[in-house]
Regions:
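Hydrophobic alpha-helical transmembrane bundles of multi-pass membrane proteins
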Residues: 2-462
Length: 462
């Protein structure tokens, strides 16, 4: 069966792909042509299989809401739509443009971000729903709603964070398979953290950012460090940095919606989540500007720091955004992670690249891993110290397990959630990374360069 599919794809591919040597400014040999054709076929088959699997699951296990199968008030789910679209903007525009900083990889960055997001959205809805049904031992048709769609975008966020670590080094085919496997492990960790440990993590500091970052870092370690010759295009230029800053601004504006999208309105939780995120991300922006001026080697503003460290407060406030936190505490969290992120970009990442042979293209260690850990720790600290009276009747809505757990026990479970996200992310990322490095996959020949996979209408040497 697979041979017939492959033969059909070969026939179609040979008819529609005849690359011109002029488009690439390189000499094409028969071997190179066959290699390119095979790479294109592998990608098309992988993508077709992935989408077909999603179609099969949606046909068998999901249905649209109707008066016959759903008695939930329509207004109660449509109230999530505004937040859903804000999260959508972050996933497709924010993340997409944030990754366009590489001077010769902007087309790939924004386009592959688009592809990964749409695959993750579908597969995330399926796997998160299935993990809850399998573990909960209730196998029924899932009636879709807007919160479920938001969970799909959250899953996409985790994969796009990992994408940042391998940006420019993994082929589109490898990225399709990375997405497929990562979403499965993401769903397992999400179920463990939220359902087994009963930890609270409204904005995903642990489930999304910590997991996605450690998964991506493990994958990039497994793939190895590009040679000095391959690193030649791992740089930015004036216009690519400006485009990346557009992504930063979209992410910065909509992060309060991301953190509060699924927060319940009872007990002023959603209001707290929005305001905590605003204060924290504003503070991280201010401290990042100050830190880059002081710590950068040229004593000037570094666009890498401004594009990324300014967002660290949004990541760090994810777990604690709807908890008993004051404005001053939220600002303190933002100030700390803004400075720490700049320190990471300036001093930590270069040393880790030498010691651990880790090539982190977007610096997700400093934007997602470290702030995610700080956010998880902040959530645990608040859990240990906050009074139950603060939450009133909404206590068990914030902490589902507090109906039978002490405050101390809940704090320890919050810490276990951090360990789970780090551990599952690291181990699964290493396994998937070794799989992607195997002989089953063609490796990226022209790293950080669009020309290997994209038609280049006009080639400019910059």
């Amino acid at each position: 069966m697979f041979t017939r599919v492959s033969s059909f794809v070969d026939t179609v591919w040979s008819g529609i792909t005849k690359p011109s040597d002029d488009d690439y400014n390189i000499v094409t040999t028969p071997t190179a042509g066959r290699s390119s054709s095979r790479a294109g076929k592998d990608f098309a088959v992988s993508l077709a299989l992935f989408q077909a699997l999603c179609l099969l699951f949606f046909a068998l296990k999901f249905n649209m809401p109707s008066p016959k199968n759903n008695d939930v008030d329509t207004k109660s789910t449509l109230s999530y739509y505004g937040m859903y679209m804000d999260v959508h903007v972050m996933i497709y525009i924010g993340f997409g443009f944030l990754m366009t900083f590489l001077r010769k990889y902007s087309m790939s960055a924004v386009s592959l971000n688009f592809l990964i997001a749409v695959l993750s959205l579908q597969w995330g809805i399926i796997t998160v729903t299935m993990s809850h049904q399998i573990m909960g031992n209730h196998h029924t048709t899932k009636i879709l709603d807007i919160p479920t769609m938001i969970n799909g975008d959250f899953a996409a966020g985790a994969v796009l964070i990992s994408f940042g670590a391998v940006l420019g080094k993994a082929t589109p085919t490898q990225l399709v398979w990375m997405t497929f496997f990562e979403i499965i492990f993401y769903s397992i960790n999400e179920y463990i953290v939220l359902e087994e440990l009963k930890a609270t993590d409204a904005g995903g500091s642990m489930v999304i950012h910590t997991f996605g970052a450690f998964f991506g870092l493990a994958v990039t370690i497994a793939l190895g460090v590009p040679s000095s010759d391959e690193q030649v295009h791992n740089t930015s230029r004036y216009d690519s940095d400006v485009f990346a800053m557009i992504g930063t601004l979209f992410l910065w504006m909509y992060w309060p919606s991301f953190n509060s999208a699924l927060v319940n309105e009872d007990g002023f939780q959603k209001e707290r989540a929005i305001m905590t995120t605003v204060f924290s991300i504003a503070a991280s922006c201010a401290s990042a500007f100050a830190a880059t001026k002081v710590l950068s080697y040229s004593k000037k503003f570094d666009m890498v720091h401004l594009q990324n460290a300014t967002l660290a407060g949004g990541v760090a406030s994810g777990t604690c955004c709807n908890l008993a936190i004051s404005p001053a505490a939220a600002i303190t969290v933002g100030l700390v992670v803004g400075i720490a992120s700049v320190v990471g970009y300036t001093f930590v990442t270069p040393r880790l690249e030498m010691i651990m042979r880790m090539s982190d293209t977007c610096g997700i260690l400093n934007l997602h891993a470290m702030p995610g850990l700080v956010g998880g720790l902040a959530g645990a600290l608040i859990t240990f110290t906050a009074s139950d009276d603060y939450y009133g009747d909404s206590l068990t809505d914030v902490y589902a397990a507090r109906a039978y757990r002490s405050v101390t026990a809940q704090g320890w479970y919050q810490l276990l959630a951090i360990v789970s996200s780090m551990g599952i992310g690291s181990v699964s990322g290493l396994i998937v990374g070794l799989f992607l490095r195997s002989s089953w996959f063609r490796q990226h020949k022209h790293k950080y360069d669009d020309k290997e996979w994209f038609h280049m209408p006009e080639v400019c040497e910059v």
